[in-house]
Amino acid sequence: MPALDHPLIDQFLDALWLEKGLSDNTRVSYRSDLALFNGWLQEHSVSLPDAGRDLILDHLAWRLDQGYKPRSTARFLSGLRGFFRYLLREKLVAIDPTLQVDMPQLGKPLPKSLSEADVEALLQAPDLGEAIGQRDRAMLEVLYACGLRVTELVSLTLDQVNLRQGVLRVMGKGSKERLVPMGEEAVVWLERYQRDGRAELLNGRPSDVLFPSQRGEQMTRQTFWHRIKHHARVAGIDKPLSPHTLRHAFATHLLNHGADLRVVQMLLGHSDLSTTQIYTHVAKARLQQLHAQHHPRG
């Protein structure tokens, strides 16, 4: 893609040099980043000062697809933020769209994820002869099918579930509501649990909690974590786990099977695409491993 200069880029860099004594290397890097972004915007018929948050996020996704490193993208965002602060100060724009874009977190460890075989073993671990086992199987199926946060899962109530349409109405961070499809397997196990195991678990006690504890109350995060570790031991999984292991597996497996990053972002309830992007590194690493193992020239 051709990089396109813009007079505002030169004005910004001149102002930055006068104010902060910008080094030649930083000046060249900022110019290159902003010119590349301007060229990308031109292909989308948008002028540089008119770039909004959504377009900036789209460009970040494009950079990721092109193989740009997180440190390079962090430098680009740093320059872009300075550029829009300059435009705002000069009254050339009304708002700074970069305020709503998070910086990439450098050096952040990749989320722990399980293989699809590990997930299958974990899902089959609960004892279905017991009500608590039926609850746990349905709970794990829903968690893996929907990629919920643990707090979202344990706080689910009956009125948030639509089995006929196969969707959950989830209340996420910041009281933001989203609809998440469950898939056929999760619906089947949830129907079975609600028909049999849940009533036995409650033993006549009233509750609108979808996955109640043995006392009929909302399950705590600690109890959920205890159940996950128990089932992992039963399944023979000795990999490091976290309460969000199945959420990470949900995102990674979707991307491994070709899901669009934006779709995964919406399903996870991430407000910013950069939060979702870290999963693409996990997915790409797995794909590279498979290529090396199975391709004749790997």
UniProtKB/Swiss-Prot annotation:
Residues 3-88 form the Core-binding (CB) domain. Signal peptide: none annotated. It is found in: Cytoplasm. GO terms for biological process: cell division; chromosome segregation; DNA transposition. PROSITE patterns: CB (PS51900), TYR_RECOMBINASE (PS51898). InterPro entries: CB, DNA_brk_join_enz, Integrase-like_cat_sf, Integrase_catalytic, Integrase_recombinase_N, Integrase_SAM-like_N, Recomb_XerD, Tyrosine_recombinase_XerC/XerD. GO terms for molecular function: DNA binding; tyrosine-based site-specific recombinase activity. CDD domains: INT_XerDC_C. Site-specific tyrosine recombinase, which acts by catalyzing the cutting and rejoining of the recombining DNA molecules. The XerC-XerD complex is essential to convert dimers of the bacterial chromosome into monomers to permit their segregation at cell division. It also contributes to the segregational stability of plasmids. Belongs to the 'phage' integrase family. XerD subfamily. This is Tyrosine recombinase XerD. It comes from Pseudomonas putida (strain ATCC 47054 / DSM 6125 / CFBP 8728 / NCIMB 11950 / KT2440).
